[in-house]
Amino acid sequence: MLFRSLVEAIVGLPTDMFYNTGIATYVWILSNKKSAERKGYVQLIDAGGFWQKMRKSLGSKRKEMSEAHIATVTRLFGDFTEAELVTVFDAAGQALSEPQLIAGTDTAPTAPEGGKLKRVPISRIFRNQDFGYTTITVERPLRDEAGQVVVGLKGKQKGKPQPDSALRDTENVPLAEDIQAYFEREVLPHAPDAWVDEEKSKVGYEIPFNRHFYVFEPPRNLHAIDEELKAVSANIMKMLEELTE
């Protein structure tokens, strides 16, 4: 479907949306009549945080999307634009408002002095080939007991090194990258005698949905953690002293 550019968008839904299953669910929007701007592209929309609790759960079904949530997803898809949720924090790390949806040409809020903005992507647009790869088979020569390369004796294999199945390996090369350039950069430095069996090459696609919406959270400052531990330890010691009095 990606190869034929039939996928317009993929929407990641919240978990616990269906009876007796808590697994992540995705809605694939397909079309064989894409608009010109969508041809060759796929839109990913992460609606995993768009939910509200049900008044009464049904098995594993505990969440539902409100009309407002559905309207937001519909807008993002219709606008075919990248978007993010932006939260403003003050210098003490307290959120000053609810996350604000910033899409397209919307103006993002500014952080106060000493504060910061937390940006979480909600809608992203990729080229079809960004998800594609070619699986190449990397062969290495079979060697005899003397360490000499074994070559074929008949037909098309005559005089050619024979592959050692025990040393056979595969590599996934992004579609946008030249296979030979990748091979020379990533394989030959480690295996100078290797070659690619082009007859075994296959094209595939993979969409690591969550990876494209991952936001790195830097670890807390070690000094701050150390100070908190000291404060907790001091409080515990004080409580113990009060118990022994």
Region annotations inferred by a language model:
Residues 1-241:
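A conserved structural/catalytic subdomain of Rossmann-like adenosyl-cofactor enzymes
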